[in-house]
Curated annotation (Swiss-Prot):
Catalyzed reactions: (2R)-2-phosphoglycerate = (2R)-3-phosphoglycerate
Gene: gpmA
Positions of substrate binding: 8-15, 21-22, 60, 87-90, 98, 114-115, 183-184
Protein name per the record: 2,3-bisphosphoglycerate-dependent phosphoglycerate mutase
Keyword Transit peptide: no
EC class of the enzyme, as a word: isomerase
Organism per entry: Thermoanaerobacter sp. (strain X514)
Family, per entry: Belongs to the phosphoglycerate mutase family. BPG-dependent PGAM subfamily.
Pfam families for the chain: His_Phos_1
Gene3D superfamilies named in the record: Phosphoglycerate mutase-like (3.40.50.1240)
Length: 251
């Protein structure tokens, strides 16, 4: 049996302001730093240790990982960063307040943009300053790989090849792996692992800063999964995520 731990980064400054973030490189809020620290302490108390870690190229995930590894006294382990673990690209919605967007377009439309598997938000133009092609961290990507907007399926289509080519073989080799990423890149991975339907994934929220453990068989098929937190805390944090797209959302 193998175990892999998935962790959504702690609350970011734009999570705090209830804004669509996507590929915007926003740092952790003070609360997010504390969430990351608590995650590290929880993993340490539960006896978890890691041989290597995977994360995105966005600082809110990277910093969460740093803090967790610091708590575990494992800052020396190899860390692999890939744009394929980035948050879903929210197109022209990036930077907009979710509650104000719900007021303008309706809560149902915002829920569809945020949660559906196959609907893309309005796209960026290539001359928009927010276009990732202007960012040096994506200099090695082809124009086709750089998104103007993404739905969840698009996100899955970049996450899963990285899982299959790089992360899965690492787990199969016997290494203990930690993945620190984002709400939608992790939702995509969970959809793949648990073979969830489009409707099931639309209702799935992953809370910030709570380790999610997957126990996998030798073929990396899930045996079971669980959060390292009590049910009430998980429920409360999931509701915070869900309420972000509502007119009164203020998470």
């Amino acid at each position: 049996m193998h175990k892999v731990v998935l962790l959504r980064h702690g609350e970011s400054l734009w999570n705090m302001e209830n804004r669509f973030t996507g590929w915007t490189d926003v740092d952790l809020s003070p609360k997010g730093i504390e969430e990351a620290r608590e995650s590290g302490k929880t993993l340490k108390a539960e006896g978890y240790t890691f041989d290597c870690a995977f994360t995105s190229v966005l600082k809110r995930a990277i910093r969460t990982l740093w803090i967790v590894l610091d708590e575990l006294d494992r800052m020396w382990i190899p860390v692999y960063k890939s744009w394929r673990l980035n948050e879903r690209h929210y197109g022209a919605l990036q930077g907009l307040n979710k509650a104000e967007t719900a007021k303008k377009y309706g809560e149902e439309q915002v829920k569809i943009w945020r949660r559906s598997a196959d609907v893309r938000p309005p796209a960026l133009e290539k001359d928009d300053p927010r276009y990732p092609g202007f960012d040096p961290r994506y200099a090695d990507l082809s124009e086709e790989e750089i998104p103007l907007t993404e739905n969840l399926i698009d996100t899955i289509n970049r996450v899963i090849p990285y899982w299959e080519s790089t992360i899965a073989p690492t787990i199969k080799s016997g290494k203990k792996v930690l993945i620190v990423a984002h709400g939608n890149s992790l939702r995509g991975l969970v959809k793949y692992l648990d073979n969830l339907s489009k409707q099931e994934i639309m209702e799935l929220n992953i809370p910030t800063g709570i380790p999610l453990v997957y126990e996998l068989d030798d073929d990396l098929k899930p045996i079971r999964h669980y959060y390292l937190a009590d049910e009430e805390k998980v429920k409360e944090k999931k509701e915070l995520v869900e309420n972000q797209g509502k007119i009164q959302g203020n998470s």
